[in-house]
């Protein structure tokens, strides 16, 4: 009479076939990992690996810049400017939104204005300006914000439009110049190849951003992180001035994510793979329960006697 002892067969299977047991455990762990990963792709938005840079990563590059607002710089009245970056902002944005990438390469520099946090930290010798400063202007190269290739040598003009005027009146009020924080409108003027080709952040309009009646702008020098920590770094850089820092807060809407259809397809493939692995493990487990005792082990059993089998057949 044929009888099955599942627990005994399973014990013998585990003790007699260690490699297969390890294989079953590994396959089970892989199936669970694929199942978990598939569920993760189903419920979580994943950043697209095809897009190396979006506007979040691009604007974060400016966080490493130090801007020096020197006390010795000459103020420039904006009414004397005939071609300011702010005056061409609207047309530049229109070109960027309506033309193809190839056309943009031939159309010259474009202007994009975004809101950003700007802090100005005056050093002790800094006494401020007698006129109302409403605009800060600087020019950098692409490599100063970590761009590579052809864009590393591209010139980027930066104009900060302050929401309120910045002058020495604040310094006189407190007895010294204190750190100020502005939500400024930053206008970037550069070749189209410098900017990411993803969804742009909300734009601000520099012409209507400041409520000051008299506009003055001042040129600032920029220093990147590599220059800051270089051996030839000048400790007296911006000694009689104010150091400006740019801060960009991550905007989830600017991150390029994997489309829902692609995520569903990835989840389906991972689920099918995990199901196949689970079926494989269950099959091996059933084999261990039903026929787990090796044939050699049965032949070595003292109750097994070939002579008795031969006599019984006779």
UniProtKB/Swiss-Prot annotation:
InterPro entries in UniProt: TMEM248/TMEM219, TMEM248/TMEM219_dom
Pfam families tied to this protein: TMEM219 (PF14940)
TM ranges: 21-41, 179-199, 236-258, 270-290
Compartment annotation: Membrane
Annotated segments matching region Disordered: 78-106
Annotated keywords: Membrane, Transmembrane, Transmembrane helix
Compositional bias (Polar residues): 80-102
Chief location bin: membrane
Gene Ontology cellular component annotations, sorted alphabetically: membrane
Keyword Transmembrane helix applies: yes
Membrane topology per record: Multi-pass membrane protein
Family: Belongs to the TMEM248 family.
Listed PANTHER family: TRANSMEMBRANE PROTEIN 248, TRANSMEMBRANE PROTEIN 248-LIKE
UniProt name for this protein: Transmembrane protein 248
């Amino acid at each position: 009479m044929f009888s099955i002892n599942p627990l005994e067969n399973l014990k013998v299977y585990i003790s007699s076939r260690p490699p297969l047991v390890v294989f079953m455990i590994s396959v089970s762990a892989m199936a669970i990992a694929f199942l978990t990963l598939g569920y993760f792709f189903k419920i979580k938005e994943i950043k697209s690996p095809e897009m190396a840079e979006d506007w979040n990563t691009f604007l974060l590059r400016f966080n490493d810049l130090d801007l020096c607002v020197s006390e010795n710089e000459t103020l420039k009245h904006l009414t004397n400017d005939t071609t300011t970056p702010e005056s061409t902002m609207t047309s530049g944005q229109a070109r960027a939104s309506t033309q193809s990438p190839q056309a943009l390469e031939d159309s010259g520099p474009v202007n994009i204005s975004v809101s950003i946090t700007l802090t100005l930290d005056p050093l002790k010798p800094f006494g401020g300006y007698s006129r109302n400063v409403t605009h800060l202007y600087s020019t950098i190269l692409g490599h100063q914000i970590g761009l590579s290739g052809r864009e590393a040598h591209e010139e980027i003009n930066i104009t900060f439009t302050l929401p309120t005027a910045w002058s020495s009146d604040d310094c006189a009020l407190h007895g010294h110049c204190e750190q100020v924080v502005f939500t400024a409108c930053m206008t970037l003027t550069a070749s189209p190849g410098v900017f990411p080709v993803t969804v742009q952040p909300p734009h601000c309009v520099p012409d209507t951003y400041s409520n000051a009646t008299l506009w003055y702008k001042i040129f600032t020098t920029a220093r990147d992180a590599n220059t800051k920590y270089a051996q030839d770094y000048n400790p007296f850089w911006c000694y009689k001035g104010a150091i400006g820092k740019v801060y960009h807060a991550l905007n989830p809407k600017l991150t390029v994510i994997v489309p829902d259809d692609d995520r569903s397809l990835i989840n389906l493939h991972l689920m099918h793979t995990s199901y196949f692995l689970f079926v494989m493990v269950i099959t091996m487990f059933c084999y261990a329960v039903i026929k787990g005792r090796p044939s050699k082990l049965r032949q070595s059993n003292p109750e097994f006697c070939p002579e008795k089998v031969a006599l019984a057949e006779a």
